[in-house]
Amino acid sequence: MIGKLSGKIDAQGDDYIIIDVNGVGYLVYASGKTLGKLSEGEFYKLFIETHVREEHIHLYGFLTIEEKNFFNLLQSVNGIGTRMALSILSNLTPTDIQIAINNEDKDIFKAISGVGAKLAERIVLELKGKVAKISTGAAIINDSLNIKNITSVASNEVIKALVNLGFSRFEAQNSVQGIVIQNPEISIDELIKTALKNRNAGL
């Protein structure tokens, strides 16, 4: 079983890379977020999950052990296979997933193509007691910023306002989280202005 590969990226496709390790090219599937951080000709270390089936052997690569752990965790949910797990990780980081599950936020998962209401509910229900066992740093974020419990900045109302201004719900929630972590006492007006300013600046 292959657990790690270190080598140069020879080629990259829509959902995979070919990594050259001592002259041998391995085809490795990866999430969109991981692929976006890789460049052809550069050297990387990838954590590998090997899936052996009767008809094939597939390798799945991750830049962090946390992403690999969540790839496996997501597949423990009924209805999620390797392709759907990668799709979710292409849209959400492990920390995003942990925060969403802790906050029972099904909408973040429903926004992902192929994830319906029932599957989103299963993700939250089936992983609620499991995500705490995987360290991502989300516990620190969640202690200081629980979307459902912050009344001082009325975060849910701000998220709705940002969605009305053209943000996706995921973009709005991430923006609110980042701003409030840095300034917990920020007013609603300033929060909205800062979110818009950050978006226009590409932050």
UniProtKB/Swiss-Prot annotation:
Tree of life domain: Bacteria
Positions of region (Domain II): 64-142
Family matches, as InterPro entries: DNA_helicase_Holl-junc_RuvA_I (IPR013849), Hlx-hairpin-Hlx_DNA-bd_motif (IPR003583), NA-bd_OB-fold (IPR012340), RuvA (IPR000085), RuvA_2-like (IPR010994), RuvA_C (IPR011114), RuvA_C_sf (IPR036267)
Domain III, as annotated region: 150-203
NCBIfam families per the UniProt record, alphabetical: ruvA
Biological function: The RuvA-RuvB-RuvC complex processes Holliday junction (HJ) DNA during genetic recombination and DNA repair, while the RuvA-RuvB complex plays an important role in the rescue of blocked DNA replication forks via replication fork reversal (RFR). RuvA specifically binds to HJ cruciform DNA, conferring on it an open structure. The RuvB hexamer acts as an ATP-dependent pump, pulling dsDNA into and through the RuvAB complex. HJ branch migration allows RuvC to scan DNA until it finds its consensus sequence, where it cleaves and resolves the cruciform DNA.
HAMAP family: DNA_HJ_migration_RuvA
Free-text note on domains in this protein's UniProt record: Has three domains with a flexible linker between the domains II and III and assumes an 'L' shape. Domain III is highly mobile and contacts RuvB.
Protein's recorded name: Holliday junction branch migration complex subunit RuvA
Native source organism of the sequence: Rickettsia akari (strain Hartford)
